[in-house]
From Swiss-Prot:
Belongs to the TALE/IRO homeobox family. This is Homeobox protein Mohawk. GO terms for biological process: cell development; muscle organ development; regulation of transcription by RNA polymerase II. The gene is MKX. Gene3D superfamilies: Homeodomain-like (1.10.10.60). Disulfide bonds: none annotated. May act as a morphogenetic regulator of cell adhesion. The keyword Isomerase does not apply.
Length: 352
C-alpha cells in the first residue's frame, strides 16, 4: 500500500511503498503462532465429527424408545383385536373353518374387516400345519402339540392379555387337557372353589334353594296343611276315626289356648284335637245338618247350631255337582258358644 508523505521543509512529496512489509507480515503462517509457547492453552472442545456422532447416537436412542413404545402399544392392540378369534379357534378346534355368518360376527366383535378375519384364520391354519408337520393329525391334536413344536420367538398358543407373542389358539395350560374334556365348559372361579366339575354344575341350584326364603307360616296355612293331613288319615281309617271323635266330643271341648298349642305342635296326632270330621258323598243324600247336630258337643243354644248346620248345607250344595266329589266339614269348637266351620272339598275313594 502506498503512503503519501508531505515534507514541510522541502514541500516535496515522498511515496513510500509499505506493501512489502505488510505482505511479509501477512504472509507469515498462522501455524507458527499457534505453535509458539506464548499462545493460549487449548480449550477442551471436541472435534466436529465426534460431536455430531454423539448427538446422532443420542437422538437414535430417544427415537428407539419412542418406537419401542409404539410397537408395544400396537402389539397389545392387535392382541386385543385377535382375542375373540383365538377363543373361537379354541372352541372349534375340531373344525376351524368359520362360516360367513360367524366371520361377520367375529369381525364385529374384534373390530376387524371380513377380509382380515378370513386372512387371520388362514394364517393360523397355515402356521399350525407348518409347525406340526406330522401327517394325518386332526386340528385338535395340532393345537395341542403346537407349543411343543414351536421354536424361537414364534407365537405361542395363548389368549392371555399379558402374553406378548400370541397370535392364535388358547392358553398353553389348556392345551394339555385330555381330548375327552374338550367340550366341557370351563368356569375358573367355580372350579377353584369346588372340588370337582360336577359340584360346579350342581352348585347354582343348591345355592338357589338355600337362598329361597319360605313365606311366613300363619295360622291359616298351618290349619290348611293340618286339615289335609288329617283328612287323608281319616279317609284311610274312617271307622276308627269316627269312634274316637265321638268319644272326644263327649269328653268335652278344649280351650282356645290348648287348641293353638295342639295346632302348632308338630308331634300332635290327628286324632288328638278338637276337630269333628264328617265325610260323605252327594249320592248318599244324608242330611248334613242332622249329622252335625248329633256330633256336636252339648249346647243349649239350638238356634246357633241350626244356623251353623244351614250354612254347612248351603256350602256343600254350592260346591261341584260331581257325584265322586265329596266334602269334609270340620267344626273347630273353641268354647261352648264360639265355633268355626271349615268345609274342605276332597276326592273320595270309592268303596267296593
Amino acid at each position: 500500500m502506498n503512503t503519501i508523505v508531505f515534507n514541510k521543509l522541502s514541500g516535496a512529496v515522498l511515496f513510500e511503498d509499505g506493501g512489502a512489509s505488510e505482505r511479509e507480515r501477512g504472509g507469515r503462517p498462522y501455524s507458527g503462532v499457534l505453535d509458539s509457547p506464548h499462545a493460549r492453552p487449548e480449550v477442551g472442545i471436541p472435534d466436529g465429527p465426534p460431536l455430531k456422532d454423539n448427538l446422532g447416537l443420542r437422538h437414535r436412542r430417544t427415537g428407539a424408545r419412542q418406537n419401542g413404545g409404539k410397537v408395544r402399544h400396537k402389539r397389545q392392540a392387535l392382541q386385543d383385536m385377535a382375542r375373540p378369534l383365538k377363543q373361537w379357534l379354541y372352541k372349534h378346534r375340531d373344525n376351524p373353518y368359520p362360516t360367513k355368518t360367524e366371520k361377520i360376527l367375529l369381525a364385529l366383535g374384534s373390530q376387524m374387516t371380513l377380509v382380515q378375519v378370513s386372512n387371520w384364520f388362514a394364517n393360523a391354519r397355515r402356521r399350525l400345519k407348518n409347525t406340526v408337520r406330522q401327517p394325518d393329525l386332526s386340528w385338535a391334536l395340532r393345537i395341542k402339540l403346537y407349543n411343543k413344536y414351536v421354536q424361537g420367538n414364534a407365537e405361542r398358543l395363548s389368549v392371555s392379555s399379558d402374553d406378548s407373542c400370541s397370535e392364535d389358539g388358547e392358553n398353553p395350560p389348556r392345551t394339555h387337557m385330555n381330548e375327552g374334556g374338550y367340550n366341557t365348559p370351563v368356569h375358573h372361579p367355580v372350579i377353584k372353589s369346588e372340588n370337582s366339575v360336577i359340584k360346579a354344575g350342581v352348585r347354582p341350584e343348591s345355592r338357589a334353594s338355600e337362598d329361597y326364603v319360605a313365606p311366613p307360616k300363619y295360622k291359616s296355612s298351618l290349619l290348611n296343611r293340618y286339615l289335609n293331613d288329617s283328612l287323608r288319615h281319616v279317609m284311610a281309617t274312617n271307622t276308627t276315626m269316627m269312634g274316637k271323635t265321638r268319644q272326644r266330643n263327649h269328653s268335652g271341648s278344649f280351650s282356645s289356648n290348648e287348641f293353638e298349642e295342639e295346632l302348632v305342635s308338630p308331634s300332635s296326632s290327628e286324632t288328638e284335637g278338637n276337630f269333628v270330621y264328617r265325610t260323605d258323598t252327594l249320592e248318599n243324600g244324608s242330611n248334613k245338618g242332622e249329622s252335625a247336630a248329633n256330633r256336636k258337643g252339648p249346647s243349649k243354644d239350638d238356634t246357633y247350631w241350626k244356623e251353623i248346620n244351614a250354612a254347612m248345607a248351603l256350602t256343600n250344595l254350592a260346591q261341584g255337582k260331581d257325584k265322586l266329589q265329596g266334602t269334609t266339614s270340620c267344626i273347630i269348637q273353641k268354647s261352648s258358644h264360639i265355633a268355626e266351620v271349615k268345609t274342605v272339598k276332597v276326592p273320595l275313594v270309592q268303596q267296593f
